[in-house]
């Protein structure tokens, strides 16, 4: 079973479902809608274009393995060339620098996160449960991709921004806007429903940023600083939920945690939206 689940994940990470825009990296079901998923059957690409797209996916996956083993700082074009079956010239046809490769990995990561967030939009619950569902999705993604989930910081460092291609920078910014727009819509819907109120100093922008900060910080520390005494003494598997609840209670986002069992919500999101990912994580003990 472990081998089977891992094989499924490797397949969709490698783009075997036909890869044009990486929308299906962590979606365990390749749907028929090619325009939506980027499936090869209706991608509209020529064989040569598809081969180029597939090769780029392969190179991104190799770069991902190198980063997981050695870290972002130790990634080089020479190492990527050695790990692949392609010449350095061919690799430079895809990426103008190692920073461009890093940005491609960050785009890969953000698209994967966006897929998880898209699932949570359809969760059957109140507005606060929907924001909790986003926290669940991000938590699961961070457990599956502890290295790539930190890309948000790496992608914004000057040494990456200065040397990455403008096209990839534009794509990353566009993706960020899409994710932010979805989060803004959720917050604004909560206000319209009467579950949340803005204050003169706090609007949707501040609330979205606060939730991202809680999610990113909590997961980054849990994944990368597990030996810290501050983290070791916390044995509760719902620690990320508690952090989110403290923020949301402080904002007065109803129902408050004293009025609703959000642990039950968290478990329901895992079961209804991410059962396959949870099953995989359990088999690899993460």
Describe every region a protein language model picked out:
Residues 30, 40-48, 65, 74-76, ...:
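Short glycine/proline-centered loop/turn elements that form peptide/ligand docking sites
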Residues 150-153, 198-200, 224, 257-260:
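Short, hydrophobic secondary-structure boundary micro-motifs
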Residues 128-147, 209, 241, 245:
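Amphipathic alpha-helical segments that line or abut small-molecule/effector binding pockets
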Residues 144-167, 220-224:
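Amphipathic alpha-helical segments used for helix-helix packing
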Residues 54, 58-65, 69, 83, ...:
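Alpha-helical structural segments
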Residues 3-43, 181, 185-193, 217-286:
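C-terminal peripheral helix-coil segments that are non-catalytic and often amphipathic
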Residues 70-100, 104:
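Helix-turn-helix
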Residues 117-118, 163-195, 204-220, 237-245:
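Amphipathic alpha-helical packing segments from all-alpha helical-bundle domains
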């Amino acid at each position: 079973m472990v081998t089977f689940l891992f094989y499924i994940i490797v397949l969709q990470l490698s783009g075997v479902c036909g890869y044009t825009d990486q929308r299906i990296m962590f979606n365990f079901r390749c749907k028929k809608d090619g325009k939506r998923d980027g499936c090869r059957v209706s991608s509209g690409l020529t064989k040569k274009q598809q081969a180029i797209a597939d090769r780029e996916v392969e190179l991104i996956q190799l770069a991902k393995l190198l980063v997981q083993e050695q870290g972002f700082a130790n990634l080089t074009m020479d190492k990527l060339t050695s790990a692949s079956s392609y010449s350095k010239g061919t690799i430079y046809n895809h990426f103008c620098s190692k920073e461009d490769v890093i940005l491609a990995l960050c785009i890969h990561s953000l698209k994967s996160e966006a897929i998880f967030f898209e699932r949570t939009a359809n969760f059957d619950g109140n507005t606060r449960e929907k924001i909790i569902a986003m926290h669940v999705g991000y938590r699961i993604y961070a457990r599956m991709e502890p290295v790539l989930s930190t890309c948000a910081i790496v992608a914004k460092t000057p040494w990456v921004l200065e040397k990455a291609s403008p096209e990839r920078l534009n794509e990353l910014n566009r993706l960020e806007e899409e994710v932010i727009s979805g989060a803004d819509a959720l917050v604004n819907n909560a206000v319209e429903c009467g579950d949340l109120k803005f204050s003169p100093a706090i609007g949707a922008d501040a609330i979205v940023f606060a939730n991202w900060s809680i999610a990113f910080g909590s997961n980054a520390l849990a994944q990368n600083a597990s030996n810290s005494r501050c983290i070791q003494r916390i044995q509760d598997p719902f620690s990320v939920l508690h952090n989110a609840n403290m923020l949301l209670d402080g904002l007065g986002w109803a129902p408050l945690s004293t009025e609703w069992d959000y642990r039950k919500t968290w478990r329901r999101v895992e079961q209804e939206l991410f059962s396959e990912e949870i099953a995989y994580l359990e088999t690899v003990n993460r």
